[in-house]
Structures are given as structure tokens and as C-alpha cells.
Amino acid sequence: MATSKLPAVSGEEETTILMAKEELEALRTAFESGDIPQAASRLRELLASSDCTRLEVGVTGESGAGKSSLINALRGLGAEDPDAALTGVVETTIEPSPYPHPQFPDVTLWDLPGAGSPGCSADKYLKQVDFGRYDFFLLVSPRRCGAVETRLASEILRQGKKFYFVRTKVDEDLAATRMQRPSGFSEGAVLHEIREHCVERLRGAGVHDPRVFLVSNLSPARYDFPLLMSTWERDLPAHRRHAGLLSLPDISLEALQEKKDMLQEQVLKTALVSGVIQALPVPGLAAAYDDALLIRSLRGYHRSFGLDDDSLAKLAEQVGKQAGDLRSVIRSPLANEVSPETVLRLYSQSSDGAMRVARAFEKGIPVFGTLVAGGISFGTVYTMLQGCLNEMAEDAQRVRIKALEEEEDTQPDVSLEAAGDNGVEKRGSGEGSMEEAPLSTRRKLGLLLKYILDSWKKRDLAEDK
């Protein structure tokens, strides 16, 4: 991923623009050739390729490993949701079954039949599921890595592809160990033992650096599930990162920030397209194209951050709240709908800083000088989309803070001590006396997210001044 530093303008911080190296070179060639229509066409291709990049993920393992439940968890669905993968106590998958992401159908998780069934050789299984068609694999096992898993791992390596070993049902292992050895039980020690065994077995199968994740499909916020998602996104090749990241459920602040960083690339590309279209001598083209382009971009941001009605309803159901309660903390003017009238109003409000932004780009990336010499459309679109992206990202954080809040009437005044890591909250009880009580996980996350959001708002205010 190439980066371009834009110089600070009027006291502003430098802006880092992320763009794949091949994309930057293609843009450079188009602009240096002086062929503006070709540049416009190339930019539209880049935007289109980001919107329709496909990611095929094969989820494999023996029967009963929890593959279907893992797919549902990765897609942010429960077992009873309409589009959920079929789960059961017996094998329910008899042929490869595709499950597109609910919001992003170009990301597909394939539920593969159970491997290691009697009468089905390894070679026959690989042919049956068309093993070579998938970009990436999740190798799932409910037990300590055995012969079936090591055979599949070897085949994935032979194809030059990557996989993560996902050890499911660790909550059941912990419960069983706690029952068998209550006096000497240590959750950390049990998880360490399971992990080390899996790593050792995979290394014995030729895996140089095994990636092992211990998860419970029923508790996607616990154990290694958040780490699984962030590691998966980070390791995807550049041409797959966009689709992979947008498919991940936002269960952490880090996931939201990574999603915002990825959408930041689209802001620059969209502004460049708008600037090029403005330079074309075709009456009426610029206005018509800009309206459609901006509406499509803003609706994409809205959906990506889970601010649409379907996503809010699903989150509300998961946390036992009303969707209206979550919607009440959304402040963006785009909360209700992205209409041409709303876009026009935001566009006019963003024109003040247009030339300043355009000059920064012209100075930072001289090859774009032809485009930004006029600067009005490019700078206005960039300023508008950047502002909307920031607002929607903050709305997404506020929604998740609200989702994690305890009911107000059951919570006394609470303060989270910045220097402490002992997980306690201070509760007032009488005059001056303080009583320590365990800080619930939901309350801790809610307070932490609120603290970070307030810090970001203070930083933004300082930058505005």
C-alpha cells in the first residue's frame, strides 16, 4: 500500500492518503498523458473494482466442528436469522453452500461438507468441494488438531494459499475442566495447553507459522474471536482487503477505525473522479454524474458503518434494546436518508474549504496539478465526503456505546479510573464513603468507548481552532 503525505495547510496536520501502488501508478500515467477522458475512465474503473472485489473463503473441517455456527458469527447472524447457515447436532452440510454477507454479497463464506467421513478419501473430498476455487481457508476443529486437520492443512499449503486454524467450542472445554478439577482450575492455563498442542501438531504437518485462534461461536466477543477478525483483515492481499474488511462485524473500536481508514481511500478516488468529470467539455454531464456518484458513496458509508435500519434492528435485538434507542444517538444529517436535496445542501456547505484542499493536493502530489488547477469540484467533494465520513464514524461509535450501556435506573454514578486495570468501579454510598464493586464487561466497554470518543472530539475541536 503506497502512501502520499499532503503538506500541512494553515496549521492543519498532514494528511496520509492510502492507495495501492499499482493504483497510484495507473493514475500517474493517465494524468501525465494529458488524456483527461482516459483519466476519468481509469478512475471509474478503480472505484468499480473496489465495489465488486470478490472474496471466496472456504470453511472446512470435520463434521460437527461448528463450521456453520462460525460462519453465522462471522456474518453477525444468529442461528434463527433468515439467511443464517443451517446448524444442528448432526451433519447438515452435504455439498458446498455459499453464504454471502448480508450487506456485502461480494464476500462469500463457503460452508464445506465435513471432511474425514467414512468411505470418503482425502483426494475424493478435495475434488468434491473443489478445493482450489477458494482464496482463503478457515480450518475448523472442535478438538485438538488431528489427522483430518493436518491433511487439510498440507493440501492448503500445497496450493500456495493461507489458512487460519480455528479451534471452536473452547467454552465447553473450559466448563468440563472446571467441573473435573475445580480446585486447580485456571482458564488461562487450559487455553494455553490447547493452543500449544494445536501449534505443535500443525508444525509437524509442515506449517511454518501456524495461526491458531480459540473461539466460542456462541460468544463472538470473547477469547480469540476479535483477534481472528483483525488478523484476517490485515493479512489479506491489497486487492482483497477492501471486501474483506467491509464484511467484518464491528464488535470493537479497532474494527470501526480500520473500516474508516479503508473508506478514506474511497473519498480521494471519488473526489478525483468528480474533478475529472468537471473538466470534460460535455454540457450537463458533471451535475448529473456528481449527484449519482455522491449519493452512491454516501449510502455506501451509511451501510458500511451499520447505520441503516436493518443493521440497527439486528444490533438492538442482540443487546436487548429498542432500535429507536440506538437511532436516537445518531447526529449525522444523513441518518434518515441520503437524498439529492441533502447532498446539495452538504455540497454547498463544503465549498468554503475547497480551494485550500485543492492547493494542498496540488502541492503534495504535483502530477494531479492538471486536475486540481481549478479545484472547486475536487476540493468541495473531498471536503464534503471527508466530513460525512467522520460524522458517520462517530455515529457508529455512539451507537455501540449506547448498545453497551446498562439501564440508567440501575446504575449509580460511576467513574472509570484511568490508571487502574483492576476492573472496579467506584460507587457513592453515603457521605464520602466509597465502595468497590466489580465493573461489568458491558459497562467497562461502554465507559471506555465513551472516553475515547470524548478524547477524539476534544482533538477535533483543537484542530478546528
UniProtKB/Swiss-Prot annotation:
List the GO terms this entry assigns under cellular component, sorted alphabetically: lipid droplet; membrane; sperm flagellum; sperm mitochondrial sheath
Query: CDD domains under this entry?
Result: p47_IIGP_like
Please name the InterPro entries in this protein's record.
G_IRG_dom, Immunity-related_GTPase-like, IRG, P-loop_NTPase
List each copy of the IRG-type G domain by range: 53-235
Reaction(s) this enzyme catalyzes, per UniProt: GTP + H2O = GDP + phosphate + H(+)
Family according to the record: Belongs to the TRAFAC class dynamin-like GTPase superfamily. IRG family.
Q: What is this protein called?
A: Interferon-inducible GTPase 5
Q: Which organism is it from?
A: Bos taurus
Encoding gene, per UniProt annotation: IRGC
